Structures are given as structure tokens and as C-alpha cells.
Amino acid sequence: MTCLHRATGPAHGPHVSIDLVVSQYGNDMTSKTSSDNLCPIARSLTFLGDAWTMLILRDANSGLTRFDQFRQSLGIAPTMLTKRLATLTEEQLLEKRQYSTRPPREEYVLTQAGRDYLPVLFMIGAWGRKHRGEGKLLRFVDAQTGTDLQPIAIDAVTGAEIGTRGIRMVVPE
């Protein structure tokens, strides 16, 4: 079940009038395969929804490609890293390439699908800076200009910033 809500009237102090609509959108997260799920967010979260996966993609964007580099950067257990790299390769966000035959060694590089995920990743970073920004934090800067990234999501059709207009989920026929 998915809960959708929308404000139906002006806010009066800390109170907002809410209509709550509960609808079935095929978002059963207990489904054995993500392809059964109608929601593209739910499908994506089946393999992108954990911190290790997102941090591996962050590090791949920063130029890390080898197992030991990811392990050192993240402090992740080898078995966990092996599983996450296998999933990211299977889901085609990373491509495994052999860089040495003796001994056989492989590296992992971002695919187009992995590069397409980067705006989402840096939006999460911007949200974290804004809402969890206490203490010292890394800054993400444009490599050419050195200016801080300030990512926003814009709807390509309307030009409106995502989050400034209502969004509905529409079930396919």
C-alpha cells in the first residue's frame, strides 16, 4: 500500500489540512522480483537502496576502480563489497574490465546507467548538507571551476523545479 497525501487548505500555525488517500500501486516490497513492481522508485531501491551501493558509485565517480581501492576508501568487509560489486555489475551500473592477466585482476568502471545515476547521488548529498549538515562535511565541487555544486532537479517538460508542484502516480493500463 502507498500513502499519498496532499494539503487541501492553508496552513494555520503548525497544522495543515490533509486528505489521505491510500491506494494500491503494486508496491509490494516482498515481491521476489523487482520487475513485478509498478513503481520505478521501488524497482530501483531493490538494488540501489543501501548506503554501501551509493558510496561505491560515489567512489567510482571519483576515479576509484579497483576492489582494494573501494575497500580502503569505505572500510567495507570484502564479502559485502563482493556482493555489492556483483549487483552493480549485474544491474549494469558498473562494468567489470580485466586490467591484468597475470595475475588476473579486474576493475570496475561506471557505465552510462551509472553515470545517469550521479545526479540522483549528488542530490542526496545536497539534501544531506542542508538537513544533516552539522560539523565538517566534504564539499562537492565542479572539477573545472572549483565552485560548489548546488544541484537541483528540474522537470524537462515544464521547467519547474521538482518539489514545487504536486506529483501524482498514474497506474499504467
Where are these regions (language model features)?
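Membrane-interacting alpha-helical segments
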Residues: 3, 13, 17-28, 71, ...
